[in-house]
Every structure is written in C-alpha cells, then in structure tokens.
C-alpha cells in the first residue's frame, strides 16, 4: 500500500525505477510514461496488484447497493426479511444452500476422480461387474435421509404460513387488469383503487414501476390477514420481503397473513402473467405506527367503483 501511495504522489519514485539498472528491474512488467514530467517508469508487480485491489474495493462499494433493503437493479440476493415467515424462509434457504453446496462438491469431486482414475489409459482392461449391493444401498439411503432432513423444516414453515393466527386487521384484495382494489372491512368497508404512478408524476422519493397512488397502510406489529381474489383473470399478490405470493383467482378467496415490526414501505408486484400490462401492477405496503394508522383511517375518504374502472397508467 505504501508503494501505491508513493506511486501516485512522488515523481521521484518513478525516477527511481527509471535509473535503476539492477537485476531486480527484470521483475517489473508494466511500462508507462508520465506526461507531466516526461519520465518513463516501470511499475512493480506489487503496485499493479495494489491498483487491482483498489479497483476491486471500488467495485464492492458500488455493488453493495445490491444488498439494500429495497429492490434495486442487478440485485443478487433476497431483500432483508421483514416478517416472521420471510425470516424462516431466509434461514431455510441458507440451510438448503449448505446442503446443496456439499452435494455439488461431492458429485463434482467424485466425477473428476472417476474420470481420472478409471480412464482408458489407466485401465486398459475395464472391470466387468453389473452391480454393487453396498453402494446401491448407500446411494438410496443417504438421499432419503437428506430429503427427510429437508422436509421437516419445510413442512414446519408451510404449516406456519398456512395457519392464520388471531388477527388485528383484515384487508380484502381484489386484482383487476391492471390494478389492485383494497377493502378494509374492519373500518366501515373503506375501499380504494391502487394504480401505478406514471413516470411524469413520479416524485423524488417514488420508485419507478413500484410506487402507486394509494398504498396499503397497516400498523406496525399488527397481525394482518389478507383475503385475496380477482375480478377478471388470475393475478398473484406477492411481496418478496414479507415472504408471500398468493394467487388471486376469480371466484375463489385465498388468504395469507403477515406481521411487520419495522416501519417503512415494502414493494411487490403481480407475479402471474395477466395480460399485456402485467408488468404495471405494483403493490406498495406502508407500515406506520398505530397512531398514524388511526389518523390515516380517519382522514381517508371512502371511494366506490360505481361500475367504472379507474384510469390506468398503462392505458
């Protein structure tokens, strides 16, 4: 690192390499010229490695945005879990990753060993046998054990997600082409449409293709049940950070639940191909304090469909 600092700050350092004719200069691979001084200098391997390290650090600093708490371009991992179900799914995913990695390494190593150990050069006369009882038992029993180990926590999470606990709030969700309609039956059937905000109406704090004109608002630390259906074709109500993806099927009501402890806005999208503007059906759930939620309910005007569809951004 000291060499790198000297390289960028002291021309004398470059002169040193220019004048040095000792055998150690044979190690230097890179030659360049300083336009400000006219000096030609060679760059030592350590300095080259240092410049690569700086570039790598800069890349990591920029790419760490991919691990932020909201969906971003080029994101390579999950959003941080915001609900009990998603926390369990996150841990289960990591658990499966260890098992999958071990299996891949074992199979790849075994394949490489067999290719080298039993090729035609090393074994000009191949062995002749049709089966091996011990090996067949092993490759049957071990996968069964692995599947059982995977199944136990998987069924536990599935049961936790399917069993609706005592809820503090119920919200009805109806999917239409191409917007969402929400109803709060616990609050005098308060209802409203939720349509994606167009590009020309976006504000600095809005997320393009994700923010809507009317968000779902729920209180923090409240158990919320969603009753989900559709009014035309099949849609899917999905919010990754909350760990649910529930199909909205016409003529059928599906349900799920969530509980969010952290205030903020959590985004999702329709995750079932539902027509030409399927990609313009975002979901935005805003989590606020209980006091703010009560104030929002009090100030929110009731809306009615009146047999009319809202004006869609995508139209």
From Swiss-Prot:
Bilayer topology: Multi-pass membrane protein
Q: An example of a Gene Ontology BP annotation on this entry? A: ATP synthesis coupled electron transport
Q: Catalysed reaction per UniProt?
A: 4 Fe(II)-[cytochrome c] + O2 + 8 H(+)(in) = 4 Fe(III)-[cytochrome c] + 2 H2O + 4 H(+)(out)
Q: Which residues are listed for Cu cation binding in this entry?
A: 235, 270, 274, 278
- One family from Pfam that matches here is COX2_TM
What is the documented function of this protein?
Answer: Subunits I and II form the functional core of the enzyme complex. Electrons originating in cytochrome c are transferred via heme a and Cu(A) to the binuclear center formed by heme a3 and Cu(B).
What name does this protein carry? Probable cytochrome c oxidase subunit 2
From which organism does this entry originate? Rickettsia conorii (strain ATCC VR-613 / Malish 7)
Organism placement in taxonomy: Bacteria, Pseudomonadati, Pseudomonadota, Alphaproteobacteria, Rickettsiales
Query: Which gene codes for it?
Result: ctaC
């Amino acid at each position: 690192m000291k060499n790198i600092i000297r390289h960028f700050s002291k021309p004398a350092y470059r002169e040193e390499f220019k004048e040095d004719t000792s055998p150690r200069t044979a190690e230097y691979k890179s030659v360049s010229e300083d336009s400000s001084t006219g000096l030609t200098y060679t760059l030592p391997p350590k300095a080259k490695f240092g410049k690569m390290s700086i570039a790598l650090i800069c890349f990591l600093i920029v790419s760490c945005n991919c691990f932020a708490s909201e969906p971003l371009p080029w994101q390579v991992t999950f959003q941080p879990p915001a609900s009990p179900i998603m926390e369990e799914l996150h841990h289960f995913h990591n658990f499966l990753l260890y098992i999958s990695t071990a299996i891949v390494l074992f199979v790849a190593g075994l394949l490489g060993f067999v290719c080298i150990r039993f090729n035609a050069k090393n074994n000009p006369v191949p062995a002749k046998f049709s089966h091996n009882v011990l090996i067949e038992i092993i490759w049957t029993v071990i996968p069964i054990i692995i599947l059982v180990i995977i199944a136990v926590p998987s069924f536990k999470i599935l049961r936790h997600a399917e069993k609706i606990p005592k809820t503090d709030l119920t919200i009805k969700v109806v999917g239409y082409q191409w917007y969402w309609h929400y109803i709060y039956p616990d609050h005098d059937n308060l209802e409203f449409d939720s349509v994606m905000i167009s590009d020309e109406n976006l504000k600095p704090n809005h997320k393009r293709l994700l923010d809507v004109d009317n968000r779902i608002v729920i209180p923090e630390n409240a158990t919320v049940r969603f009753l989900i259906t559709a009014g035309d074709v099949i849609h899917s109500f999905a919010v990754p950070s909350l760990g649910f993806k529930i199909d909205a099927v016409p003529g059928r009501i599906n349900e799920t639940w969530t509980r969010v402890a952290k205030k903020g806005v959590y985004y999702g999208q329709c995750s079932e191909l539902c027509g030409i503007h399927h990609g313009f059906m975002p979901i935005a759930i805003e989590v606020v304090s209980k006091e703010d939620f009560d104030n929002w309910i009090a100030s929110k005007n009731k809306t009615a469909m009146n047999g009319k569809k809202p004006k869609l951004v995508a139209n």
